[in-house]
Amino acid sequence: MELFVGTDIVEVERIKKAFDANSKFLERLFTQKEIEYFNSKRMKLPHIAGFFSAKESISKVLGTGISGFSWKDIEICHDEKGAPAVILKGKAKNIADKKGIRDIKLSISHTKTYAISCAIAIGGEKNDSADLKTDERS
């Protein structure tokens, strides 16, 4: 068994600059469900920065950085209690399966100026994916 940990912190201003400079910023990095969540929060930049940070943290858990798969292969959502949750798709899911990762726990926090996240997973054994939350459409 192996413990995988990833953390990330991002300045909200950095996300604002990227958002202002590229009209396709959201569509390039986030799934439709994530964008719908941002719309429900009136596109508040700290929420967007938090999801960005979470995707970075998860890429560190997977050990590849974002270069190993698409940004949209990681989807941030919320469980029935409102806690952040992770859905892996495509290449990100394949990497998690190879590492035997069954579940990823995620924490996200933000202020007006920073967003931070921490992702933790246990793996190391071959996994049948039964416990990992996935999107079967991918």
Swiss-Prot record:
EC category name: transferase
Query: Which is one GO molecular function term here?
Result: holo-[acyl-carrier-protein] synthase activity
Where in the cell is the protein located?
A: Cytoplasm
| Cofactors | Mg(2+)
**Main location per the UniProt record:** cytoplasm
Q: Which reaction does it catalyse?
A: apo-[ACP] + CoA = holo-[ACP] + adenosine 3',5'-bisphosphate + H(+)
EC assignment: the record states 2.7.8.7
GO BP terms: namely:
fatty acid biosynthetic process
Top-level lineage group: Bacteria
Cite the binding residues for Mg(2+). Answer: 8, 56
Tell me a GO cellular component.
cytoplasm
What are the cysteine partners in each disulfide bond? none
Q: Which SUPFAM superfamilies match?
A: 4'-phosphopantetheinyl transferase
In which family does this protein belong, per the annotation? Answer: Belongs to the P-Pant transferase superfamily. AcpS family.
Please describe what this protein does: Transfers the 4'-phosphopantetheine moiety from coenzyme A to a Ser of acyl-carrier-protein.
**The name this protein goes by in its record:** Holo-[acyl-carrier-protein] synthase
Gene symbol of the encoding locus? acpS
